[in-house]
Amino acid sequence: MTYARSILVPPGSPGTYHCVSRCVRRAWLCGEDRDSGRSYEHRRQWVEDRIGELAEIFAVAVWGYAVMSNHLHVVVQVIPQAAAAWSTDEVAARWLRLYPRRDQDASVRAEALAGNESRIKELRARLCDLSWFMRCLAEPISRRANREDGCKGHFWEARFK
């Protein structure tokens, strides 16, 4: 029986989780495809770099990860107390590292964001949310892989488990 993610991982509560994301359509995350002879090993670095980047931005500790040929494992500890201790400016700066906009000066955008308390509250919650962490890990990798493979659509099978 499946349970809602909000029941398994209550928002705003600390915990350590083992998350798994699998590729769809027999796509390769990394390794070498024996049928085509094509190597996807460079994608391992994409995943490693993104995990490192997100670990600096989110209120999480990454205890381990494994990048396999068609899936990845991540062991993450969510630390909401860390996000609660961040200043308004720090929350804004972290969010803008995650979602930079090219059409607006970063300092202007950070100032506007820091002045919006309700938005800061929402972003603080997102920066210590397991689902947001996994979303921010998976989405850029799937976009790059789809672009490289010349296809569209899902790269990951359902949501992470």
Predicted feature residues:
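Short catalytic/metal-binding and nucleic-acid-binding patches
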Residues: M1-K161
